[in-house]
């Protein structure tokens, strides 16, 4: 015979589990966000993706990863984009050009992990990023391919992790 807990005890157990999950979250993650594109549109070149964050620890280094998700409608084997880091006063403190290979150029086989016709690839773009001062920042990703609208793009994500003892 199974003995059931009264409702108030069940709520207590559920609350405790929720608290434990929250306490076990990764404190080294400063930002972990994803922006999805409209399915029928893709990534429009003149519409950069923006991520907002607040930096308090300026002594630590951070690793910045981009997570690209695309489907079989993506027309190229690679992706060029421009990541920018903008401080709270609107000044660009870092800008670059990044490329990732999404499909093998010879075989056409997708790189990264896939499920159905959607593939995901995570890659490092900055290994030792430092912020000059505490405050609000914006990270912007601009599509840099030679087409106005990039079909087949599902989403772009950004993961910013504090490096432990100088390493991730």
Provide a role label for each language-model segment.
Residues 25-28:
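Bacterial signal peptide processing site
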Residues 2-14:
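Bacterial N-terminal signal peptides that target proteins for export
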Residues 132-148, 152-162:
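Internal, hydrophobic beta-strand segments that form the core of beta-sheet-rich folds
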Residues 59-62, 123-143:
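Short tyrosine-centred short linear motifs in exposed loops/low-complexity segments
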Residues 75-81, 152-155:
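Short coil-to-beta strand junction motifs in C2/discoidin
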Residues 20-23:
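C-terminal motif of bacterial Sec signal peptides marking the signal peptidase cleavage site
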Residues 47-48, 98-103, 110-125:
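A beta-strand/beta-hairpin structural motif
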Residues 66-74, 145:
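Short amphipathic, basic-aromatic surface patches that mediate peripheral association
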């Amino acid at each position: 015979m199974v003995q059931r807990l009264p409702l108030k005890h069940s709520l207590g157990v559920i609350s405790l589990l929720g608290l434990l999950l929250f306490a076990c979250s990764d404190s080294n993650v400063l930002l972990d966000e994803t922006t999805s594109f409209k399915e029928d549109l893709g990534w429009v070149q003149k519409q950069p993706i923006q991520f907002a964050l607040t930096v308090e620890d300026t002594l630590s280094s951070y690793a910045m990863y981009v997570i690209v998700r695309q489907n079989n409608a993506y027309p190229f084997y690679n992706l060029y984009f421009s990541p920018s880091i903008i401080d709270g006063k609107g000044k660009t403190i870092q800008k670059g050009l990044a490329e990732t290979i999404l499909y093998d150029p010879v075989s056409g086989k997708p790189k990264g992990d896939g499920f159905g016709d959607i593939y995901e690839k995570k890659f490092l773009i900055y290994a030792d990023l430092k912020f000059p001062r505490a405050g609000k920042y914006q990270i912007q990703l601009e599509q840099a391919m030679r087409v106005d609208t990039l079909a087949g793009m599902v989403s772009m994500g950004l993961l910013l992790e504090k490096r432990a003892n100088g390493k991730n």
